[in-house]
């Protein structure tokens, strides 16, 4: 029996799309990447040419209307996730949205409700849960190796300063928040994933800005990205 073929369109042509989504989707035998959309026309055309993607757009609504993709990847500044996902779902497309799914619970629920009502999949790019370390820890947790897990503390160590200073990642009007929405969401996902996504009884959190202003614009994102290790701690 032949595999079902899926046509993919992507909104956003940043680094995660270039080094992650495009090559990984193109490696699948039953998937074709049909179109790429970005507001930077020069960049999107150059990337599409390099990656052998046949069509480019600067208007995602036009892309959804003309391409009619089976799957839409959304990798744009966080503030645009909700409207773009709703448009893609309304057009009948499954959606893979970069984290965070939305900027509020109410917005996320609206997106999930629409996906459910249309029988479509809406998923989030929480890729750290698929790392070798987390998958091994999950297998051990499911096998009962840790006993009853009733509390988890998850920690993310990162250098001081603000890597990428000046980009949309550091602009609240586009990112919707700070480090909690950016890297904190991965830490929370790891903890909840390892525990089987229980319903939390209490939640507390804190963020600190004391270290942030040091070393403005110094270097890149650091060496923690995509390392096959986990800082999740079980207390």
Task: Describe each PLM feature range.
Residues 1-51:
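N-terminal Rossmann-like dinucleotide-binding module
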Residues 17, 74, 97, 122-124, ...:
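Hydrophobic residues in well-ordered beta-strands that form the structural core
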Residues 128-232:
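Predominantly a Rossmann-like dinucleotide-binding segment in NAD(P)-dependent oxidoreductases
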């Amino acid at each position: 029996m032949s595999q079902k073929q899926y046509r993919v369109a992507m909104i956003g042509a940043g680094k995660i799309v270039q080094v992650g989504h495009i090559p990984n989707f193109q490696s699948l035998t039953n998937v074709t990447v049909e179109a790429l959309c970005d507001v930077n026309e020069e960049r999107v055309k150059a990337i599409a040419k390099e990656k052998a993607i046949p069509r480019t757009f600067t208007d995602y609504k036009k892309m959804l209307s003309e391409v009619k993709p089976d799957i839409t990847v959304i990798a744009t500044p966080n503030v645009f996730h909700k409207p773009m996902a709703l448009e893609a779902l309304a057009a009948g497309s499954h959606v893979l949205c970069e984290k965070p799914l939305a900027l509020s619970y109410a917005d996320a629920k609206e997106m999930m409700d629409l996906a459910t009502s249309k029988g479509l999949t809406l998923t989030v790019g929480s890729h750290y849960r698929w790392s070798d370390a987390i998958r091994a820890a999950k297998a051990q947790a499911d096998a009962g190796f840790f006993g009853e897990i009733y509390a988890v503390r998850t920690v993310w160590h990162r250098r001081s300063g603000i890597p990428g200073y000046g980009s949309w990642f550091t602009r609240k009007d586009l990112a919707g928040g700070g480090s909690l929405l950016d890297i904190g969401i991965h830490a929370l996902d790891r903890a909840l994933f390892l525990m089987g996504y229980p319903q939390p009884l209490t939640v507390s959190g804190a963020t600190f800005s004391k270290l942030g202003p040091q070393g403005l614009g110094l270097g890149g994102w650091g060496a923690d990205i995509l390392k096959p290790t986990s800082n999740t701690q079980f207390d």
